[in-house]
Amino acid sequence: MPDEASANPSRKIFLIATEESGDRLGSSLMKALRRRLGCSVRFEGVGGQTMAREGLVSLFPIEELSIMGFTAVVKQLPMIVRRIRGTADAVIAAAPDVLVIIDSPDFTHRVARRVRARCRGLPIVDYVSPSVWAWRSGRARAMRSYVDHVLALLPFEPEAYRRLGGPPCTYVGHPLLEQIGVLRPDAQERQRRDADPPTLLVLPGSRRSEIRHHLSVFGETIGMLQQSIPEIEVVLPTTPHLVDEITPAVATWPRRPRVVIGEDDKRAAFRVARAALAKSGTVTLELALAGVPMVAAYKAGSVEAWIARRVIRVSSVILANLVIRENVIPEFLQEDCVPGKLAPALQEILTDSPMRRRQLKAFDGLNTIMATGQRSPSELAADIVIEAMRESRARM
């Protein structure tokens, strides 16, 4: 591999990540780029704590944008618009070699459009595809005017972009692939997974709005489940910024869960859990890679639910189902997200039932479906970012 550090003595990369998941992606990408380009590479932009540990000084705290739901967004709209304009101005002022936008398309794509209008020669790479394959498919074609390359986390996304007339799209792999070793149990942990009483993971979401929508329903579900499995152990992984809200809320549950904080404790819980009750989202893919059968649920505000029903065009909202291309994970959405339906489904996957066996068989093939060869997702992503800079300089 050529020594980019000596061939390219100075590079400035502007990254924008406004959610925790994007912050983690950005941090891994920064590490991979620094390995390739050396210490001369400089980073500017927007990010969270993990990107800060890699040296990024964020334009503003990303917690400002951790809002979800139509009504909440409307209330914060003036602040959001101000941040979009300010971030675009900062990109132009920085004059970077490349702009990398990471997830959060409602924010990052608006910034990218503003930047492209004012600086047409700046390459723009989108790390994490918007869900154009699920809803608002016209976005794919529209992205051609302001995104030069999409880095996909899901293996079916490049084909979707070709079909929809979008920009070039390359599957680089999901960051969860780098965690398989710490997600899957060793022999002793597998024995604990199969032992009684069973351990159930409860994952109500990572945003405050999600917690509010799911926590009480999940608590009632555990109460119903405890009637048939009295000694069930319940573990609820969460993050430091949510623990103060979650801890008092679960104190009144019929079966009080053990709340664990941080990635290490979360992964340890994954390795011994027999099953999980999870809010629909990336965590379903994480559970599938860990080999944990699950029931998925999602409840949104009435306005968001009304909109979603009219625009979503996929057979399942569960990421793991979409990657596997088979609806093996039961999903209970909106009015179906009730204890009377969740508890029986959980009881079924906690036992050696056909549903549990079907999920485990499907999960066994997930590695092959998502494989990226010998290189990590962040390394593959760094390749494309570097190539975008190289092509841009060649045109100058």
From Swiss-Prot:
Listed pathway(s): Bacterial outer membrane biogenesis; LPS lipid A biosynthesis
Domain of life per record: Bacteria
EC number: 2.4.1.182
Any Pfam family: LpxB
Catalysis: reaction(s): a lipid X + a UDP-2-N,3-O-bis[(3R)-3-hydroxyacyl]-alpha-D-glucosamine = a lipid A disaccharide + UDP + H(+)
Gene Ontology annotations for the cellular component aspect, listed alphabetically: membrane
Sorted UniProt keywords: Glycosyltransferase, Lipid A biosynthesis, Lipid biosynthesis, Lipid metabolism, Transferase
Gene Ontology molecular functions: lipid-A-disaccharide synthase activity; phospholipid binding
One Gene Ontology term from the biological process aspect of the record: lipid A biosynthetic process
InterPro entries with a match to the protein in the record: Glyco_trans_19 (IPR003835)
Keyword Transit peptide: no
SUPFAM superfamilies associated with the record: UDP-Glycosyltransferase/glycogen phosphorylase (SSF53756)
Its job: Condensation of UDP-2,3-diacylglucosamine and 2,3-diacylglucosamine-1-phosphate to form lipid A disaccharide, a precursor of lipid A, a phosphorylated glycolipid that anchors the lipopolysaccharide to the outer membrane of the cell.
Family per similarity comment: Belongs to the LpxB family.
Protein name: Lipid-A-disaccharide synthase
Species of provenance: Nitrobacter winogradskyi (strain ATCC 25391 / DSM 10237 / CIP 104748 / NCIMB 11846 / Nb-255)
Lineage: Bacteria, Pseudomonadati, Pseudomonadota, Alphaproteobacteria, Hyphomicrobiales
